[in-house]
């Protein structure tokens, strides 16, 4: 048997143990512990179900092969084998994918940062278009998105915007969106009808709670100030806005979206923790760098990953050579085909590495 299957029985045994614990009245009365065990069981349930079916198919193949020597039953046995053997191969591939090492961040919420880059006003407008695309995709996934920091431009775009996206397995779906996104289109301000090229960068970071990554208070410098406004009643007369600086890295975060200092500081700490963690993770040239590298890019924000060509209604993902002539639908949040292709490419590369 392939080495990857050798640990499957351990998974089955662990699943059985989890179900025994979940049936324990004491565990059922401990809501937090019960939820933790339920989540753990849910994460491996598909593996258990596929492996159970796989073992049944193996047994059915053996039974059918034993009937090949029976003249009366042989035709029926051959018919069964013609269906069972392809299913066996499909289940084996599915199990290999299910048994690939999981990214520990896959089930986390994310902080996504989008910045207008090369292209002036047009790049800021494209940053806003990307935000709308991700918002619509999030709605299709029943996720929630909220803006935690933003810097707008006079033309209605974004110099930069940071959002929190929460829901099931958000990072697993959007982690491949980090990089430089290039747009080719005729800007609204272009009078000659010429196509311009602009760029916006996207950064995707898993949301880190204190349990994952701790910011030392001694490393933080904080300032409180009044949040901006249009004047009159809109100007906050109390210093509710917060600026946090991580002194070792110089990373700075400011937050003024909330009405209270406590809420702004809490949001600022979460954003700062994710940025600092991401900074150190990218500096690590050994273990984390090897984990982060994949068939679909490094995750570096400067790496050009995708081009959106409006005149030709075309989107091209350069990492996997995928081209789709449905830009209008993709910008409307129909990102599933692109994201699924990226996930499959990543899994295929990992399987190839495993089989070396």
UniProtKB/Swiss-Prot annotation:
Record keywords: Cytoplasm, Methylation, Protein biosynthesis
For this UniProt entry, the molecular function terms from Gene Ontology, in alphabetical order, are: translation release factor activity, codon specific
Q: What does this protein do?
A: Peptide chain release factor 1 directs the termination of translation in response to the peptide chain termination codons UAG and UAA.
| Major localization class | cytoplasm
**Compartments where found:** Cytoplasm
For this entry, the protein name equals Peptide chain release factor 1
Q: Which Pfam families match?
A: PCRF, RF-1
Species annotation: Leuconostoc mesenteroides subsp. mesenteroides (strain ATCC 8293 / DSM 20343 / BCRC 11652 / CCM 1803 / JCM 6124 / NCDO 523 / NBRC 100496 / NCIMB 8023 / NCTC 12954 / NRRL B-1118 / 37Y)
Coiled-coil portions: none
Mention any one GO cellular component term assigned to this protein in its UniProt record.
Answer: cytoplasm
Family affiliation: Belongs to the prokaryotic/mitochondrial release factor family.
Gene3D superfamilies found in the cross-reference section: 3.30.160.20, 3.30.70.1660, 6.10.140.1950
Q: Which InterPro entries match?
A: PCRF, Pep_chain_release_fac_I, Pep_chain_release_fac_I_sf, Prokaryotic/Mito_RF, RF-1
Task: Report what the Swiss-Prot or TrEMBL entry states about this protein's PTMs.
Answer: Methylated by PrmC. Methylation increases the termination efficiency of RF1.
Which parts of the sequence carry N5-methylglutamine?
233
């Amino acid at each position: 048997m392939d080495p990857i299957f050798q640990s499957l029985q351990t998974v089955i045994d662990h699943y059985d143990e989890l179900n025994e614990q979940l049936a324990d009245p004491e565990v059922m009365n401990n809501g937090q512990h019960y939820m933790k065990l339920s989540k753990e069981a849910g994460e491996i349930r598909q593996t258990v179900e596929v492996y159970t079916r796989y073992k049944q198919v193996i047994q059915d193949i053996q039974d059918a092969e034993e009937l090949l020597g029976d003249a009366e039953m042989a035709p029926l046995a051959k018919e069964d084998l013609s269906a069972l053997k392809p299913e066996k191969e499909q289940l084996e591939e599915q199990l290999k994918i299910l048994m690939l090492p999981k990214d520990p961040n896959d089930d986390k919420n994310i902080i996504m940062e989008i910045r207008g880059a090369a292209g002036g006003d047009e790049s800021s407008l494209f940053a806003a278009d990307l935000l709308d695309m991700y918002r619509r995709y999030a709605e299709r996934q029943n996720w929630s998105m909220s803006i935690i920091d933003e810097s707008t431009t006079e033309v209605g775009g974004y110099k930069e915007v940071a959002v929190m996206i929460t829901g099931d397995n958000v990072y697993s779906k959007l982690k491949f969106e980090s990089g430089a996104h290039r747009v080719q289109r005729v800007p609204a301000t272009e009078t000659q009808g010429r196509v311009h090229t602009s760029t916006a960068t996207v950064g995707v970071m898993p949301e880190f709670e204190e349990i994952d990554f701790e910011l030392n208070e001694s490393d933080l410098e904080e300032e409180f100030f009044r949040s901006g406004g249009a004047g009159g009643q809109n100007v906050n007369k109390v210093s509710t806005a917060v600026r946090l600086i991580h002194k070792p890295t110089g990373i700075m975060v400011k937050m003024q979206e909330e009405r209270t200092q406590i809420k702004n500081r809490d949001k600022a700490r979460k954003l700062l923790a994710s940025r600092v963690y991401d900074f150190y993770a990218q500096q690590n040239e050994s273990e984390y760098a090897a984990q982060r590298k994949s068939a679909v890019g490094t995750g570096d924000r400067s790496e050009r990953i995708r081009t959106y060509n409006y005149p030709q209604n075309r989107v091209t993902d350069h990492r996997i050579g995928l081209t789709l002539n449905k830009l209008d639908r993709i910008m409307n949040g129909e990102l599933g085909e692109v994201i699924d292709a990226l996930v499959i490419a990543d899994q295929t590369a990992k399987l190839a590495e495993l089989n070396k």
